Amino acid sequence: MLVNGLRLNELRKDLTDSQGWDAAKAQNFLPAELKLPNEVFVQIRENTEANFRLRIFEDKLFVQDKVNNQICSADFVGLPPFSKNFTNDLTPFEKIVVYNGTCNLNFTWNYYCDYFRTKQECKFCNLTPAQDFYPEENISNARKNAAQVADVIHAAKKYHPDPKSILTRGTPADKQGLGGTVQILEELAERFPYSNQRERTKVLMTISPTKDINDVKLIYDLGLHSISYNFEVFDKGYWKAIVPGKDSFIGRDLWEESLIKAVEYYGPGRVFSAMIAGMEPRKTLIEGVNWCADRGIVPIVVPFSPETGSHFEGFRPPTYKWMMDTHLEAADIILKKLPFMGTEEYWKLDAPICAECFTGGFIYDVVKENAGLIDYHSGNELKKEKLISEKEESIS
């Protein structure tokens, strides 16, 4: 489903025929993600030619194959109880954040990427054009400020004992600049003080290094929990072709140096780099997984799924077997070279994301399953009611 998407037209018919939905409402229905058995959350990508589809039988949702076999049960993922809240400047939360599963908050604080202006954008990316193709999604092209991000996290903490956040942005016009990073980290440190590493607000920032290697330490000193400098592709030839802006303005050597330097400050398990499975040969992708793991860097293996508005729109991703074999090999490497990834302690105390709620891929679902970990969401649960009363909150 991550690779080839889902057919949704049959589901829309079921919604009108058996669930009493208005035809127009059903026709426009596009759910963002699904919850599958064993607490696996997955993004939904509509594809009218997909091998799988969603159907409703006896008021229950199922994934069905092309010959009408029921593959597994499924559930839509509801919004958290604070989703209709407003920030202190009266901006609706739906303009600030996207929810992944029940534990992860996903912020893109700036959808503008200057590489699109200079024609050096990452070839797989549709970050800036996405606004034209997905107007119904709960995202906004407007820049989100530090206080708004902190307001959402503050609200999440009232209903969830340990919410995690992923923060990303496009490359700013000053391509070597920090692009709002400093302001967000200063706001988070003020709103959520910490006295040790594990008390830092669990935020994973996926940003570009700058030309100044000292900025790696600067961002750490400002209180960031975890950092991801994404390779996207590991092979150096593909790197130049697929991520020309990163190659031109930062360069591969400095990118690698920034990752290695980050481990010195954050420690193993808090530095990440994403690589897209299917964008390059498996051999070089696996070389990238090994390169990262050997240096204490956690690989994020993301299945290639061509995006509308990107240079790869209309391309076919690899087969399911290729993708599964690649993920299994990558997971084996991760568990062998980063053994802490196979412990409940890491996922509960140190990981900046919830493995089950990470909808950008399924590598961590495989890692946890192969390690025999079954404490889904690290024992955390999103509550329908506040964890503390308004009275207790005002006293604290």
Where are these regions (language model features)?
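Active-site mouth loops of central-metabolism enzymes
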Residues: 110-112, 133-147, 203-210, 278-280
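Auxiliary Fe-S-binding modules of radical SAM enzymes
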Residues: 1-65, 286-396
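Generic hydrophobic, aliphatic-rich segments that mediate packing or membrane embedding
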Residues: 118, 145-149, 184
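Intrinsically disordered, low-complexity coil segments
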Residues: 135-144, 192-200, 335-345
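Conserved alpha-helical substructure of the radical SAM core
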Residues: 129-167, 386-388
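Conserved AdoMet/S-adenosylmethionine-binding subsite of the radical SAM
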Residues: 150, 154-160, 168-315, 322, ...
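Short, flexible helix-coil linker/hinge segments at the edges of structured domains or between repeats
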Residues: 121, 138-146, 237, 246
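N-terminal [4Fe-4S]-dependent radical SAM core
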Residues: 38-123, 127-141, 346-348, 362-370, ...
